[in-house]
Structure formats: C-alpha cells, structure tokens
C-alpha cells in the first residue's frame, strides 16, 4: 500500500514541483544574500564612525597614543602573531585579538591603516573633541583642533574655534564649486572655441583657401576668446587667493601639530559629539556626494558621477544601435529569407556568437572599429586634426558599437521567437483585406512582436552593461577629464573616452595603492552598478508590459 502511495506521489509530479520550488528558493536566497553583503559592506562606508583614543604599548617599546576608527576585529592564534615578529609572551591564551585601525594622517605616518594587538590597548576612550578632517589630498586627518587662522593670524581658538572652522569650511566648499564651474565650463568653452578655430584654419590651409580675409576672421575670433580668457583668469586668481586664505592648526594623538589649509578640507566633523539624527543627515549627504561628485586620490575617495554617466550613456547608445539592427536581421530571417540550409547555418552562427568570449569582441573592436574604420573616418573627415587621431582612437562610439556587436545575437533570437509566435491567420487576414506584405509587417506583425523586441533589448542591456574586458580596449579609462555630453559643440562627443562602473570596480579593487581604503568603495560601486542595470531593465520591462497589454486582443 505504501509502495502504491509512493508511486502515485511520484506520478503526480509533486517531487518535481518541490525540487523546482526549492531551487527557486535557493536562487532567491543567494541573490538576496549577495545583495545584502554588498549593501552592508558598501553603504556602511559613509556612516560617520566614532573615533577611539587609547594608549598603545608594545612590550619593550615606548607608549604612544592611537586615534582612529576601528575597522575590523579578528581573533588570531598567538603563534601567528609571534611568527610575524611581535613580542608576544610565551605564556597566555591561545588566541589574541587583532584590530585594524584607520589612523589616517598619511602625511605624518605614511599609512592610513595599521594592525594592532587589542590586548595592548589601554585606557580606551571616545572624547567628544576628537575630529575627522576629510581632505582633498592625503586622506583623513584625526586629532583635535587647536586654532583657526586667516592670512596666518589666529582668529579663533579654544571652544570658539570649532564653529568658526565650520563656517570657513562651508565658505571654501562654495568657492570650490565656483572654481570648478569656471575651470570646466567657462575655460572649457574657450579652449573648445580656440581648438575649432585652429582646426578651421588647418582645413582651409589644406584646401588652399586660407586667404587674408579668412586669416583676419580667425585672428579676430582668437583675440576675442583670449580677452575672455584674461577676464576669467583674473577671476580665477582672485578666487584662488580667497580659497587659500584660511588655515587651521590641528594636533595628533602624540602632540604633533600640523597646519592644514582649509582650502584642502572637504568636511570637518566630530563624530563622537554627533547625535543619531545628525549622523543620519551626514550619512545621506555623503551618499549624495558619492553619487554626484568627481573621484579624488586615485579614485579611492570622492564620488563616481563620471562613471555613472559614462555607463548609462554607453548603454543607451548601445541599445539604440543594437535594437534596430537586431530587429532587421530577425525580420529578414523569419519573414523574407527562404528556410533552407543557408538560413539554418546563419541561425546556428548567430546562436554561437552569443558564446564568444567578450575579450574577443574587444580585440575585434580595437582592430576593426578603432584602427580601420576610425582611421578611415579621420582621413576622410578630420584630416585637419591629423596626426592627432579623432575617431582613430578608443572612444564612446567604438565602445558602444563593440558592445552592440556582442549583444546583437540576443536581440535577433528574442525577436525571431516573438515573430514565430504570431498566428499565421493574422498575417493571412491582413493580406486578405488588401494590405501588402510590407504594410502587414509594419502595421500588424511588428507591433505584436514589440514585447519580444523589448525582451531582446532587456537581455542585451543586461549582457552588455556589466562587461569590462572589451571596454578596456575600446574606450574606457581610469579617469576621464570631461563628460562626453556638455555645452560645447557638437555637444555629444562620441570620440571621447569615458569612465565605466565595471572598470571602476576593477581599477579601485585591484589597481589601488591603498587597498583598505578602496575596499568599501568597491562594494558601494558594485551595488550602484547593480542598481543602474536594474533601473534600465525595469524601465524596459514596464514598456514591454505596456505594449503586451496594448496588443493582447490581437494575439487572441
């Protein structure tokens, strides 16, 4: 009886349902766990951690004071510390505590982080007057504030120094924004104008049309731009003088004083004196700074806005290229091509293209798009700029085309499947009513297959947006000096190199000189890359569902 019940249970298909449900549950748990690890390790970086101050005494050495953030604690065998050369006594517990402390003050100590033995820390405290100074160079400074100076003269010290410092830092950050706007926008526009005049003159010279009138026009335009530059240079000089006017004197844990220009200070805060609400507000301001600012200190500090912008821009251009070409190829293969051996071979080749390693596409993009196609474009349309390449060098356009080539098989397959699902009776009914094949395709078939096209585009975005290997060859760099979209003609600069979130993760994680400082930024950037791809995909899913509902009646 039990055997019959067991056989009936297997025949009912219940085991398959349980196995499938378990597999889905495991996949969901793994995905949530992965995102949780990335989020916790990445987003925790922006929280203003409390500072500790303690006496650290290594046996047989002089005592010194340690100030910093506790980043990590771990239990390690005593023998491991002893083999590392630390003066650990022979007798004692088997395991000892080792702590990673972010001590900052790289210009004084040489290192941002240090490992210490927890048992050798004494008199640990969290004084409210300890401050963190986030600098534009040399990382964080940890210590106490002594005084604030203006033009070398002390204007505030003691308790009055802290509010004065906050006001001066806020003033300096406003000046920094003005300087950045002048240098990138105004001076950038002047440099762009001068370069256009130079190229125009070179073009006229190559064509033999450079006469006195043209030369006078160019000289007039160049003189006007140079006059504008002199005015801006005077404003810049004044702003730089104001920017470097103030300074502060800070003292580290061992009593050494250091004078720091407030122009180099991004934030100054006392985390031990901050309440929970104040920390929450500061946390969100740091997250926004991470999303909207430019990177600093070899990409280990600051923001990643250029990488976000470059990733989104490249993905959108790739989608605009791959979708029409993929759809056209699928329409031809399904609607017009004879279903013979050659067509089957083409389909097999398209399916196999989806399995080609991404780096192969990168090598092809570099060899064909950049050197052959880009070099030809330069010789035909940008001869005046030679020997400096315009499109004959890696850039945004070639990166987008390379990823489009990588993703086009996905769009072809998805669109073909959508076209195959459209009932034959729909086509025959349209033709019977007098429509031509082209009208049937344009008015009936393609609208009904549009959800499948969107599915192909979603898969293409998911495949291409996270690729790094080919982009290293065809247009992505560690640090891009300007964005590919700005206010200078022709506004969208397809020849410019870009930053990319995927490459940024690789660069920060594996090419950074300061590994401990870069580690949380790797997780934060990885989380952001997932969110960017998810946002692009969800937008496409919403459009696909809208189209599916719109043409649902025709399917039935």
Map each language-model feature to its residues.
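Membrane-topology segments of multi-pass transport proteins
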Residues: 1-21, 25-33, 39-299, 555-556
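Membrane-interfacial helix termini and adjacent extracytoplasmic/periplasmic loops
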Residues: 283-302, 337, 361-405, 475-477, ...
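Interhelical loop and adjacent transmembrane-helix boundary motif
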Residues: 298, 475-527
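Transmembrane-helix boundary motif in ABC transporter permease subunits
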Residues: 318-350, 371, 540-549
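Membrane-embedded alpha-helices of multi-pass transport/permease systems
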Residues: 324-329, 360-363, 398, 405-426, ...
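Hydrophobic transmembrane alpha-helices
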Residues: 349-356, 369, 400-411, 461-465, ...
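Transmembrane alpha-helices
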Residues: 411-416, 423, 437-475
């Amino acid at each position: 009886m039990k055997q019959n019940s067991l056989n009936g249970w297997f025949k009912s298909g219940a085991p398959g349902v349980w196995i499938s449900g378990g597999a889905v549950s495991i996949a969901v748990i793994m995905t949530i766990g992965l995102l949780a690890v990335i989020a916790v390790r990445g987003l925790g970086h922006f929280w203003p951690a409390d500072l500790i101050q303690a006496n650290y005494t290594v046996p047989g050495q002089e005592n010194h004071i340690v100030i910093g953030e506790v980043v990590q604690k771990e239990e390690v065998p005593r023998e491991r510390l002893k083999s590392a050369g630390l003066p650990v006594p022979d007798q004692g517990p088997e395991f000892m505590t080792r702590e990673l402390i972010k001590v900052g003050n790289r210009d004084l100590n040489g290192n941002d982080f240090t490992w210490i033995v927890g048992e050798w820390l004494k008199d640990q405290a969290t004084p409210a007057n300890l401050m963190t100074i986030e600098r534009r160079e040399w990382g964080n400074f940890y210590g106490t504030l002594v005084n604030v100076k203006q033009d070398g003269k002390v204007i505030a010290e003691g308790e009055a120094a802290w509010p004065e410092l906050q006001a001066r830092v806020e003033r300096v950050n406003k000046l920094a924004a003005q300087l950045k706007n002048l240098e990138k926008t105004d001076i950038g526009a002047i440099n762009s104008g001068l370069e256009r005049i130079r190229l125009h003159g070179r073009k006229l010279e190559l064509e033999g049309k450079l006469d006195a009138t043209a030369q006078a026009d160019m000289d007039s335009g160049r003189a006007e731009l140079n006059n504008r530059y002199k005015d801006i240079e005077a404003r810049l000089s004044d702003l730089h003088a104001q920017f470097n006017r103030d300074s502060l004197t800070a003292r580290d844990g061992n009593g050494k004083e250091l004078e720091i220009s407030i122009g180099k200070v991004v934030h100054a805060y006392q985390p031990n004196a901050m309440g929970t609400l104040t920390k929450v507000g500061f946390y969100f301001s740091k997250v926004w700074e991470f999303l909207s600012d430019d990177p600093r200190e070899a990409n280990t500090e600051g923001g990643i806005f250029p990488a976000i912008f470059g990733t989104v821009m490249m993905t959108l251009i790739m989608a605009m290229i791959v979708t029409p070409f993929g759809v056209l190829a699928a329409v031809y293969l399904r609607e017009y091509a004879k279903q013979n051996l050659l067509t089957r071979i083409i389909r097999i080749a398209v399916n196999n293209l989806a399995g080609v390693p991404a780096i192969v596409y990168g090598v092809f993009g570099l060899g064909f798009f950049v050197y052959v196609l880009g070099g030809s474009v330069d010789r035909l349309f940008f001869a005046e700029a030679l020997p400096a390449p315009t499109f004959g060098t890696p850039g945004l356009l070639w990166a987008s085309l390379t990823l489009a080539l990588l993703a086009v098989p996905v769009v072809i397959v998805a669109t073909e499947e959508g076209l195959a699902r459209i009932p034959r009776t729909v086509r025959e009914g349209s033709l019977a009513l007098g429509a031509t094949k082209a009208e049937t395709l344009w008015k009936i078939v393609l609208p009904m297959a549009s959800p499948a096209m969107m599915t192909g585009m979603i898969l293409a975005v998911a495949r291409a947006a996270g690729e790094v290997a080919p982009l290293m060859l065809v247009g992505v760099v560690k640090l891009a000096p300007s964005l590919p979209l700005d206010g200078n003609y022709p506004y969208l600069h397809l020849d410019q190199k870009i930053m990319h979130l995927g490459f940024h993760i690789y660069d920060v994680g594996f090419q950074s000189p300061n590994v401990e400082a870069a580690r949380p930024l790797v997780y934060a950037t990885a989380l952001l890359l997932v969110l960017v791809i998810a946002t692009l995909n969800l937008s496409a899913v919403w459009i696909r569902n809208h189209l599916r509902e719109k043409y649902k009646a025709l399917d039935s």
